[in-house]
UniProtKB/Swiss-Prot annotation:
UniProt-annotated stretches for the region E7 terminal domain: 1-47
ZnF unnamed span: 69-105
Gene Ontology terms for molecular function: DNA binding; DNA-binding transcription factor activity; protein domain specific binding; zinc ion binding
Lineage of source species: Viruses, Monodnaviria, Shotokuvirae, Cossaviricota, Papovaviricetes
Localization terms from the record: Host cytoplasm; Host nucleus
SUPFAM superfamilies given in the database record: E7 C-terminal domain-like
Protein source organism: Human papillomavirus type ME180
Name of the featured protein: Protein E7
Subunit structure, as described in the record: Homodimer. Homooligomer. Interacts with host RB1; this interaction induces dissociation of RB1-E2F1 complex thereby disrupting RB1 activity. Interacts with host EP300; this interaction represses EP300 transcriptional activity. Interacts with protein E2; this interaction inhibits E7 oncogenic activity. Interacts with host TMEM173/STING; this interaction impairs the ability of TMEM173/STING to sense cytosolic DNA and promote the production of type I interferon (IFN-alpha and IFN-beta).
Motif Nuclear export signal boundaries: 87-95
PTM comment text: Highly phosphorylated.
Amino acid sequence: MHGPKPTVQEIVLELCPCNEIEPVDLVCHEQLGDSDDEIDEPDHAVNHHQHQLLARRDEQQRHTIQCTCCKCNNLLQLVVEASRENLRNVELLFMDSLNFVCPWCATETQ
């Protein structure tokens, strides 16, 4: 390309017909290092780690929930302690029928 703007005459396309399909070597010629460097965990260690994760899922953890008041739409922040399974049940209630009322709207309706 010569000049500030390309023109169709300046564009040169070179097309080569490729009728032959060249074979590709898919064999990996990579060599592995010594297996002494690798740390192989026995199955009981892996199972123990999975057991720890499952136990952690059942323990009570503190979670912060942000929602809005169903009357005035003010932001509410709740802190609950629940297991992951129970927190999931609370999330399902939020999506279904559970509504929260802020303290100001709660005192006005009484």
